[in-house]
Amino acid sequence: MKGVILAGGTGSRLHPLTRITNKHLLPIYDRPMVTYAIETLVSAGVTELMVVTGGTHAGEFLRLLGNGHEYGIDRLLYAYQERPGGIAEALGLTERFVDGDRVVVLLADNVFERSLRPAVTNFLAQESGARIVLARMEDPAHLRHLGVPELDDQGRVVHILEKPDDPPSNHVVTGVYFYDERVFEIIPTLRPSGRGELEITDVNNWYVERRQMEYDVLDGFWGDAGESIDAYYEVNDFVRVHGANKG
């Protein structure tokens, strides 16, 4: 299975910090944010990676990561997203790298307390389809700003809503997604959303509608360090005290 780390975007929610660098190069405790995403995948056994970035600081990822061997990566490639076209568009740039394999996609501003190895193992045991990782969240106001799954009586995902006014569950979709090879057939069929981007939620709902979406529920802390300045410092404080990607 290949791994894709998405490290693009404008980082506008972290201005003014991101006026001088890519948000994924900002520090989380004692090292750059993107290195936690790399550690997340490598510690879960995924060691062939592609980093997708964009903007004016793309070269800094090469300076930081090089060939990736220092971080336990067996093979590291890079792709450049020329404009902010959405997560699904960024994933589409990796098709030749993935080359018919399965893929795990990780947003580089997502930080996890616990290892994702159980989710990787569960996805590899799936015959086909997709898999997401959910986190429990009790704050309705926060739920309204995230992707929220609707679950039926059997606990199966029946729809994923983006930023719902009335959240249908107390779970959120974190920034890690697992797909079979069909994902690269789905992406070209997507229509841009109102903000002009190809949305990963539309990809996920394609699998949901065909009853081919499974999920795991996280144990431990999960934070989106790119969500806001407050969230960025919350993740920093947690990692400083508790660490990340623990087995």
Regions found by a protein language model. Give the residues of each.
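A structural signal for short hydrophobic beta-strand segments in well-ordered beta-sheet cores
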Residues: 25, 149-151, 215
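Short loop/edge segments at beta-strand edges and connector loops
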Residues: 80, 107, 134-135, 161
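Conserved donor-nucleotide/metal-binding helix-loop-beta segment in metal-dependent transferases, i.e.
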Residues: 114-143
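Short, conserved catalytic or adaptor-binding loops enriched in Gly and charged residues
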Residues: 67-73, 150-152, 206-208
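Anionic-ligand binding region
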Residues: 133, 139-170
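Conserved N-terminal catalytic core of the sugar/cofactor nucleotidyltransferase
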Residues: 2-5, 13-16, 27, 31-118, ...
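Active-site glycine-centered loops adjacent to acidic/histidine catalytic or metal-binding residues
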Residues: 9, 109, 136
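Catalytic-core segments of class I nucleotidyltransferases/pyrophosphorylases
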Residues: 121-124, 156-246
